[in-house]
Swiss-Prot record:
This is tRNA:m(4)X modification enzyme TRM13. Its EC number is 2.1.1.225. Residues 55-78 are annotated as: Disordered. Disruption phenotype: Increases cellular ROS (reactive oxygen species) levels. Sensitive to oxidate stress induced by rotenone. Mildly slows cell population growth. Zn(2+) binds at residues 75, 81, 91, 95. Residues 62-73 have a biased composition (Basic and acidic residues). It catalyses: cytidine(4) in tRNA(Pro) + S-adenosyl-L-methionine = 2'-O-methylcytidine(4) in tRNA(Pro) + S-adenosyl-L-homocysteine + H(+); cytidine(4) in tRNA(Gly)(GCC) + S-adenosyl-L-methionine = 2'-O-methylcytidine(4) in tRNA(Gly)(GCC) + S-adenosyl-L-homocysteine + H(+); adenosine(4) in tRNA(His) + S-adenosyl-L-methionine = 2'-O-methyladenosine(4) in tRNA(His) + S-adenosyl-L-homocysteine + H(+). A zinc finger (CHHC U11-48K-type) spans 72-99. PANTHER family: TRNA:M(4)X MODIFICATION ENZYME TRM13 HOMOLOG. Keywords: Cytoplasm, Metal-binding, Methyltransferase, Nucleus, S-adenosyl-L-methionine, Transferase, tRNA processing, Zinc, Zinc-finger. One of its GO terms (cellular component) is cytoplasm. It is found in: Cytoplasm; Nucleus. It comes from Saccharomyces cerevisiae (strain ATCC 204508 / S288c) (Baker's yeast). tRNA methylase which 2'-O-methylates cytidine(4) in tRNA(Pro) and tRNA(Gly)(GCC), and adenosine(4) in tRNA(His).
Length: 476
């Protein structure tokens, strides 16, 4: 084992002919596959990793090169990669992040901050959370649940027959994602979202590889093949895929492959393949209307979907839909609103943002109504604590831990008086915090989309996914 300048212990792998990084990855039981310089022991990324872990300079030189002390620093545009400090200026001009930041400059659907909260709050301002904030927030949560009568969300785990026939047989072991997709699709079916499938378009926010859209498309295609003869051949469907990241192994082609297979099995059905439009953009900066189809007299409708839309992206998405005149209000062509349904499976409330949260007034009203006399809680501090508490409901338990075990939840605060609860109580508090954030979103949707029903459901059991809450919005 090696240990450099008080850095983490590193197992030295056997030398190889290629100049391979000497860092040994214990979890994968192999050494790093990156190539290193002949003057260095490690690749640049593992050098940076070790420096972060040890909070010190790690020796990475052989011979006289050790005296030069070139330093690698995180790229200011993307801290996930590092550069030589003496080449930083040159790197910034050619960094891929520079190109990506200007990728949409000339696009009609791009407007910086369009779906943000107009700078109402600057979440970049650091808010220090104390043990007192944490304890008061927990006590306030209990009062909120008692006063607002927040019952447990209904479980609506449904099974889509197509998924059972086509998808589950392909998965002999891990079916958790398929079970979730099946339930979400069938909940959309029950909500009437697939009526008149020949004119349905879908928008998937935070689509990633678009696996969810692939199976939505598969169900849509089977519905099209079962249409009566008078409707055959008239379908015009589109999938708009929104994501800010670059994704590998995308499912876009699978949608076309599924169509080809279904078409070959039903050659007499004159159905058309759905078109696919993938847009790489942050939802914060997205104007939907330039992307969507809308002409007077058409019967096109849109269903907005997402499976595990992360943190603040859910708030930005709800604003994005509400800001679209084509989806939500009369557009410039005099057409009726095109929105038919919304289905968003939410996750990662711990990365929600108090400045961009969609319903500040709701959380503020809870704080003002239920905080104790002399409380130091404000909207900002309470929301920050909520995001921290949310992880308690989804982080799971360590092996051998019992639900009755006692934990001190303010242990990380130096000098704080102990505040002890059981493991089970901690999990419940996490779920309560998550519910408050989701409830505020639900209230926003009900106020904004008055012609729609809106509800929160548990679409699978928690043993399938701990992130098992979805918002379902459909026409009254």
């Amino acid at each position: 084992m090696l240990q450099d300048n008080n850095g983490p212990a590193v197992k030295r792998a056997k030398p190889s002919e290629r100049l391979q990084c000497e860092y040994f990855m214990e979890k994968k039981k192999r050494r790093c596959g990156m190539t290193r310089s002949s003057q260095n022991l490690y690749c640049s990324e593992h050098l940076n990793l070790m420096k972060k872990a040890a909070n010190s300079q790690v020796h990475n030189k052989n011979g006289s090169e050790a005296e030069k002390e070139r330093e690698r620093v995180p790229c200011p545009l993307d801290p996930n990669h590092t550069v030589w400090a003496d080449q930083l200026k040159k790197h910034l001009k050619k960094c891929n992040k520079t190109k990506l930041s200007h990728l949409n400059d000339d696009k009609p659907y791009y407007e910086p901050g369009y779906n943000g909260e107009n700078g109402l709050l600057s979440s970049s301002v650091k808010i220090d959370i104390t043990a007192e904030h944490l304890v008061q927030s927990i006590e306030l949560l209990y009062k909120v649940f008692e006063g607002e009568s927040m019952d447990e969300l209904p479980l609506r785990q449904l099974n889509n027959k197509l998924m059972s026939l086509k998808r589950f047989p392909q998965l002999p072991s891990n079916t958790k994602h398929a079970v979730q997709q099946s339930s979400l699709i069938e909940n959309l079916v029950d909500a009437g979202a697939f009526e008149r499938p020949e004119s349905l378009n879908f928008i998937e926010f935070g689509c990633g590889r678009a696996e969810f859209s692939r199976y939505v498309s598969l169900y849509l295609l089977t519905q099209l093949t079962s249409l009566p003869a008078e409707h055959s051949g008239s379908n015009s469907n589109e999938f708009v895929l929104i994501d800010r990241a670059t994704n590998r192994m995308k499912f876009d082609k699978k949608i076309k492959d599924d169509f080809s297979e279904i078409k070959s099995n039903s050659p007499s059905k004159p159905i058309s393949c759905p078109s696919i439009k993938r847009i790489k953009i942050d939802i914060r900066d997205l104007k939907m209307d330039p992307i969507l189809k809308s002409t007077p007299g058409d019967d096109i409708q849109y269903v907005c979907i997402s499976k595990h839309l992360c943190g603040v992206a859910t708030d930005l998405t709800l604003r994005c839909i509400g800001n679209s005149s084509i989806l939500h209000g009369d557009d410039n062509n005099g057409c009726n609103p095109k929105l038919k349904a919304i289905c968003i499976a939410m996750c990662c409330r711990h990365v929600c943002d108090y400045g961009d949260y969609v319903n500040r007034s709701y959380v503020t009203s809870l704080v003002e109504k239920y905080r104790a006399h002399g409380s130091i809680l404000t909207y900002e501090t309470f929301f920050r604590v909520l995001t921290k508490l949310c992880s308690w409901g989804t982080c799971g338990r360590k092996p051998g831990t019992a639900i009755t075990d006692i934990v001190n939840v303010v242990e990380s605060f130096e000098g704080a008086e102990p505040y002890t609860i059981t493991i089970k109580e901690r999990e419940n508090i996490g779920l309560m915090a998550r519910r408050v954030i989701d409830e505020g979103r639900l209230v926003y949707v009900k106020e904004k989309f008055t012609e729609f029903n809106a509800e929160l459901i548990r679409y699978v059991e928690s043993d399938v996914s701990l992130e098992n809450v979805a918002m379902l919005v459909y026409k009254k």
